Amino acid sequence: MRIHYLLFSFLLVLLSPLSAFTQSINNPITCLTKGGVCWGPCTGGFRQIGTCGLPRVRCCKKK
């Protein structure tokens, strides 16, 4: 039974840094620091990595 507690604590420590990578981009400053640009639709060689806080304004980054 003690192995369950060890396994749970190991997984908790192992997976806790993943929350830092799943934070959404939702303002222009974060978009720029992540290497993106605030633009309307992401076209051509760009992909959407978040939003810039306004409706229809997306944070786009080159593919």
Swiss-Prot record:
> Which terms does the record give in the GO molecular function aspect?
CCR6 chemokine receptor binding; chemoattractant activity; phosphatidylinositol-4,5-bisphosphate binding
Q: What are its GO cellular component terms?
A: extracellular space
Record-annotated disulphide pairs = C31-C59, C38-C52, C42-C60
The protein's matches in InterPro entries, at most eight in alphabetical order, are given as: Defensin_beta-like (IPR001855)
Q: Which GO terms describe its biological process?
A: antifungal innate immune response; antimicrobial humoral immune response mediated by antimicrobial peptide; cell chemotaxis; chemotaxis; defense response to bacterium; defense response to fungus; defense response to Gram-negative bacterium; defense response to Gram-positive bacterium
Record PTM Pyrrolidone carboxylic acid, positions in chain = Q23
Q: Does the keyword Cytoplasm apply?
A: no
| Keyword terms, alphabetized | Antibiotic, Antimicrobial, Defensin, Disulfide bond, Pyrrolidone carboxylic acid, Secreted, Signal
Q: Where in the cell is it found?
A: Secreted
Identify the stretch annotated as signal peptide in this record.
1-22
Gene3D superfamilies hit by this protein = Antimicrobial Peptide, Beta-defensin 2, Chain A
Q: Hey, what tissues is this thing expressed in?
A: Highly expressed in lung.
What does this protein do, in the record's words?
A: Exhibits antimicrobial activity against Gram-negative bacteria and Gram-positive bacteria. May act as a ligand for C-C chemokine receptor CCR6. Binds to CCR6 and induces chemotactic activity of CCR6-expressing cells.
Which protein family is it in?
A: Belongs to the beta-defensin family.
Query: What is this protein called in UniProt?
Result: Beta-defensin 4
Where does this protein come from, organism-wise? Answer: Rattus norvegicus
Q: Which gene encodes it?
A: Defb4
